From Swiss-Prot:
Lineage: Bacteria, Pseudomonadati, Chlamydiota, Chlamydiia, Chlamydiales
Keywords: Aminoacyl-tRNA synthetase, ATP-binding, Cytoplasm, Ligase, Magnesium, Metal-binding, Nucleotide-binding, Protein biosynthesis
Entry keyword annotation includes Ligase: yes
Protein name: Lysine--tRNA ligase
Organism listed in the record: Chlamydia felis (strain Fe/C-56)
A single GO molecular function term of this UniProt record: lysine-tRNA ligase activity
InterPro entries from the UniProt entry: Aa-tRNA-synt_II, aa-tRNA-synth_II, aa-tRNA-synth_II/BPL/LPL, Lys-tRNA-ligase_II, Lys-tRNA-ligase_II_N, Lys-tRNA-synth_II_C, NA-bd_OB-fold, NA-bd_OB_tRNA
GO biological process, one term: lysyl-tRNA aminoacylation
Reaction(s) the record says it catalyses: tRNA(Lys) + L-lysine + ATP = L-lysyl-tRNA(Lys) + AMP + diphosphate
C-alpha cells in the first residue's frame, strides 16, 4: 500500500472508524449538512469577557447569556459528573463544560443504552468538530466557560492530532500537512491571518492612492518583464506553447499606455528556478505603475507603504524586533525616510571596494578572492554585471536596516531609463533591502520605444552567444504599445511572500506559504 494510504491501516484510524460506525448506528449523522446561527469565539470573548455573568449554578438555571459556537475539540478531561473540553475556533479557544445532568447530545435517542455524558466521554475524540449550544459563566479561577446544553457532532476526525506537547516538530510534515500545522500551532495560525491582513492592507493603501487594481493574463504567448526561466505548457485548443508569466510588468505598462494613470495588480508569478529560504517557484507579487513620476517618487511610495503596514500591524509603532537573524536579535525601525545609497557607494561602504578605482580584471580577481561564485559565472561578464555580482556577494547580507540601493548598471535591466545625469552605463533603478533580503525592485520606466527596441535586441544578441541561455523573443506587441506613446512613469514590484516573512519574523518563505512547493514523495509515483 502506498504511503499516502498508510493511515488507513493504523490502529487509531481503525478504532475511530469503529466509533464512527457506532455513532451512525445510534442514528446520529456524524457529518451533518449545516449548523447555522453560530457566533465566533472571538465575538463572544469581546462581548462577554468583561461582564458579570455569574457562576455555573447561574448557568444551570439558564440565567446567563446563551451562545452557539462551533470548532475543533483540542483538549478534553473528565472529572466525575463533569467533563471539560477546549474548543478551537479559527485562532481563538474557549473552555466548555459538559454536565451529566444538564448536557445532551443532538440526535441521541432517549432510549439509547449510552447516556449523553458517556457518549461524550467514549465516542468523541480530540480533533472532532463540535457544535456547542449553552450558557456562559465564569469558573472559580475566572475562566470564561460555556455550560453545554446540547453538543452536536459536526465532523468525526478519523486521524489523531499530533501530541499536544510535542506538536509538529518535523518541518517537512508541517509544510506538507499544513492543515495539521494550523490546528496545532497558535503561532502558525497567527502568521497566516497576518498574511491575509497584509494583502488587505496593501489593497487599502493602493486604493487610497487612487491606483486601479486590474487582472492580467497568467498564460502568455511571450514571457517578459524579468530575467527568469519560465514554465512552459501547451494550449491544446490552439496547438501552441504558452508560458506562465514571470512578471506582471509588460501587461501593466500596456494598460498605462491605454490611459489608466495609476494601475496595480496582486497576483501569482512563476519562475522555473531554484528553491531556497527566500525563493519558491510560485509566488505572489504586487506590481504598480503610475504616470508622471520617477524612481525618486516611487521610493517615497514604497517606504510609506511599508511604514503604513508595520504601523497597522504593530499598534502604530514602526519598530519591529527580529529573532531569526544570524547576527542575533535586532530591532528595526521602518519609519520613512529610509537610507538611500547608490550601488557603487554601497559596495564601497559595506564591501570596502571602490569600483571606480578598479578595472574589470581587478574586479574579477576581487570576486575570485571574496565570493563563493564559480569563476565561470563572471569570467566573461561585462563590467556592469561584475559590479552587480560584487554587490550581491559583499553587500546584500549587511543591509539589515531598510535601504534603497539606487543607480544600477545598465546591464542589469533593459527596461529602465538611463541616469538623467548622462551616465548611460547606469540606470534609474533601485532595489529596497531589509534584513539582508531584497524587498522591492523599481524603475524610472523606459518609455522611448526606439531605445527600448535597441536594448532588447542587444539583450537577445548576447543571449544568442550564450549556449546556456534560452531563446527569448522580443515582445513586438509591447514595442508597438510604446510606439503609441507612453507617458513618463515610475513602477515597482514587491514580492508579497518575502514581505510577509519580514513583517512576521519568519525564517523561511515556506513558513508564510500555505502549501510551498515540495519534492515529490516516492510513494506519489506509485
Amino acid at each position: 500500500m502506498s504511503a499516502k494510504a498508510e493511515y488507513l491501516q493504523q490502529e487509531d484510524f481503525l478504532h475511530r472508524s469503529n466509533k464512527l460506525q457506532e455513532i451512525s448506528d445510534l442514528g446520529i449523522n456524524p457529518y451533518p449538512y449545516e449548523f447555522p446561527g453560530t457566533s465566533s469565539v472571538e465575538e463572544i470573548k469581546n462581548e462577554f469577557s468583561s461582564q458579570s455573568l455569574g457562576n455555573s449554578e447561574d448557568a444551570t438555571n439558564k440565567n446567563t447569556p446563551k451562545v452557539k459556537i462551533s470548532g475543533r475539540m483540542v483538549l478534553f478531561r473528565s472529572m466525575g459528573k463533569n467533563a471539560f473540553a477546549q474548543i478551537l475556533d479559527n485562532d481563538q479557544k474557549i473552555q466548555v463544560m459538559f454536565n451529566r445532568d444538564f448536557s445532551s447530545v443532538a440526535g441521541l435517542p432517549e432510549d439509547a443504552e449510552i447516556t449523553p455524558i458517556k457518549f461524550i466521554e467514549k465516542k468523541l475524540d480530540l480533533g472532532d468538530i463540535l457544535g456547542i449550544e449553552g450558557y456562559l459563566f465564569f469558573t472559580h479561577s475566572g475562566e470564561l466557560t460555556i455550560l453545554v446544553e446540547t453538543v452536536t457532532l459536526l465532523g468525526k476526525a478519523l486521524i489523531s492530532l499530533p501530541d499536544k506537547h510535542a506538536g509538529l516538530s518535523d518541518k517537512e510534515t508541517r509544510y506538507r500537512k499544513r492543515w495539521l500545522d494550523l490546528i496545532c500551532s497558535d503561532e502558525v495560525r497567527q502568521t497566516f491571518l497576518k498574511r491575509s491582513r497584509i494583502i488587505k492592507l496593501i489593497r487599502q493603501y493602493m486604493d487610497a492612492q487612487d491606483f486601479i487594481e486590474v487582472e492580467t493574463p497568467i498564460l502568455q504567448n511571450i514571457y517578459g518583464g524579468a530575467e527568469a526561466t519560465p514554465f512552459v505548457t501547451t494550449l491544446n485548443a490552439l496547438h501552441s506553447d504558452m508560458f506562465l508569466r514571470i512578471s506582471l510588468e509588460i501587461a501593466l505598462k500596456k494598460i498605462l499606455v491605454g490611459g489608466t494613470p495609476r494601475v496595480y495588480e496582486i497576483g501569482k508569478v512563476f519562475r522555473n528556478e531554484g528553491i531556497d529560504r527566500t525563493h519558491n517557484p510560485e509566488f505572489t507579487m504586487i506590481e504598480a505603475y503610475a504616470m508622471n513620476i520617477d524612481y525618486h517618487s516611487v521610493m517615497v511610495y514604497v517606504e510609506n507603504l511599508i511604514e503604513y503596514l508595520v504601523g497597522e500591524l504593530n499598534n502604530g509603532s514602526t519598530v519591529l524586533t527580529y529573532s531569526h537573524l544570524k547576527q542575533g536579535p535586532q530591532t528595526i525601525d521602518f519609519k520613512a525616510p529610509w537610507i538611500r545609497m547608490t550601488m557603487k557607494d554601497s559596495i564601497k561602504t559595506y564591501g570596502g571596494v571602490d569600483v571606480d578605482l578598479h578595472g574589470d580584471h581587478e574586479l574579477r580577481n576581487i570576486l575570485k578572492e571574496r565570493s563563493s561564485l564559480p569563476e565561470e559565472s563572471y569570467a566573461t561578464a561585462p563590467r556592469g554585471l561584475l559590479i552587480a555580482a560584487l554587490f550581491d556577494e559583499l553587500v546584500c547580507d549587511k543591509l539589515i536596516a531598510p535601504h534603497h540601493i539606487t543607480d544600477h548598471p545598465l546591464e542589469t535591466t533593459p527596461l529602465c531609463k538611463s541616469l538623467r545625469s548622462g551616465e548611460e552605463d547606469y540606470v534609474e533603478r533601485f532595489e529596497s533591502f531589509c534584513l539582508g533580503k531584497e524587498l522591492c525592485n523599481a524603475y524610472s520606466e523606459l518609455t522611448d520605444p526606439m531605445r527600448q527596441r535597441m536594448l532588447l535586441e542587444k539583450q537577445m544578441e548576447k543571449k544568442a552567444l550564450d549556449p546556456d541561455s534560452e531563446y527569448h523573443p522580443i515582445d513586438e506587441e509591447f514595442l508597438e504599445a510604446l510606439c503609441q506613446g507612453m507617458p513618463p512613469a515610475g513602477g515597482f514590484g514587491i514580492g508579497i511572500d518575502r514581505l510577509v516573512m519580514i513583517l512576521t519574523d519568519s525564517a523561511s518563505i515556506r513558513d508564510v506559504l500555505y502549501f510551498p512547493v515540495m519534492r515529490r514523495l516516492e510513494s506519489e509515483n506509485d
